[in-house]
Amino acid sequence: MDPLGATANLVDINSLPKWSTTPVPNYEPGSNESQSSSFLSPFPVDEEINAKVVLWNGDITKLAADAIVNTTNESLSDRGALSERVHRAAGPELMQECRQQLLGCRTGEAKISEGYNLPARYVIHTVGPRYNTKYKTAAESALFSCYRNTMRLVRENKISTIGVCVVNTTKRGYPPEDGAHIALRTVRRFLEKYGSAVDTVAFVVEGAEAVVYAKVMPIYFPRDKLEEAHALTLMPDDIGNEEGEPIIPERQIRIVPKPPSLQHGEDVEEAEEAEGHLDMTELHVGKHAFAVMAGDHDQMTKQRAHRSDDGMKVVEQQRVYQRWLRRARTENFADFSRQKILYQSGVDFLGRPVVVFVARHFTAQNTDLGKAVAYFISVLDRIVNRDYVVVYFHTHSTEENQPPMSFLKELYHIVDNKYRRNLKAFYIVHPTVWARIVTWFFTTFTASSVKEKVHFLSGVQYLYDWINPDQLDIPAYVLEYDMKENGTNYHTPASTYRTGGL
């Protein structure tokens, strides 16, 4: 009996055609040959490596291998098509292990779990980066880390066959071809060092990914000398270091192999003899501290002034926040407490405090907004010192419950940076169209740092994917509205652990 729970339509990784056996395109000889005679390829033909590599267009959840790779998010609960398919095929036990034992995964890291009902014995979870051209270098380094850490787990756990998915996703904005270069290059370098420990690495692609990988594969896994020569014309400028890691020129140590004088054949002995006749005074000319060139003093002064301005802004922000904090510790907030506008309600599955805001209880038009700011700070200041999440119930709220946009902007800039940094999710339950529009404008033009953390939920039960119902103190009118609009049991959480069934 197969302990992995074999099902129909499984594909044995060992039955897939190896890259070395696939047909090679008819490359036109000529300029490529002359180029290959002048330059050595950093990725030469290697029949042994090519016999370990597979490019397969298929469903990774059907692949019978020692392990498969799943691209997910930091909480190991991504709702992308691939991740959902993996969890659906594995069964609820996989999510239970992710929540109870793995406890999240940072971008660039990789963690391993059992495969449960999957044909693969293990699942290696990794979190790909979000791509932003402004932070391209960081994204490239993080994606490299995903593949490097994945292959490290392969070696540590003595995994001989693995199906590797495309870690970079269009959902996170990563250019597919750029991601393919990093993936293939990193695995190639790994196989060069540790190939004896691995039998098969299958790059599992779907749809448009297949075209991209078919184009890039020959660069890092050429099948003959003609393809190797052709690959030189397609080689990117950055081919990585000995591990495949992207090279950052600004961080390279520049060492001159020879002093300029020696490169021009100057006689060292003659130079030393001439130096011996110099007066001691001459030897020290220009070596005193006051004679050393120190750069453009005007430019340095401007830079110091700029840094000083930035520092002053930070100091001023902290001073303003401390003033509000002192007020928060002295005010009487009995009225706000009775209204239950803002309160902590248990923790989520990762142990992060859950802060609840009930919009209907906040009569913004008739409230001293200054006092409201102080109240919010009094409740949140100690909570936000660590990771936390916010649940905002928009249910039955009206215009009088919504503070002006100017107030939200001011509040955003008043609070300490820890509020933004440690906020991991902001769930808006029962949002209206207008609420979605206002949120989009606010997170786009004012609070861009939290935009990716906002999630709109049309029903309360969707919260149970992240928070146990026992940990939520939900107003009765919210539950009544939710039942009226959505009915009962309209959503089943991904595992019994999430619903408190275990």
From Swiss-Prot:
CRAL-TRIO domain residues: 329-486
Pfam family, one: CRAL_TRIO_2
SUPFAM superfamilies, alphabetized: CRAL/TRIO domain, Macro domain-like
Xref: CDD domains: Macro_GDAP2-like (cd02905), SEC14 (cd00170)
Domain Macro: 40-221
The organism's place on the tree of life at top rank: Eukaryota
Coiled coil start-end: none
Family: Belongs to the GDAP2 family.
Protein name (database record): Protein GDAP2 homolog
Organism of origin: Nematostella vectensis (Starlet sea anemone)
Gene expressing this chain: gdap2
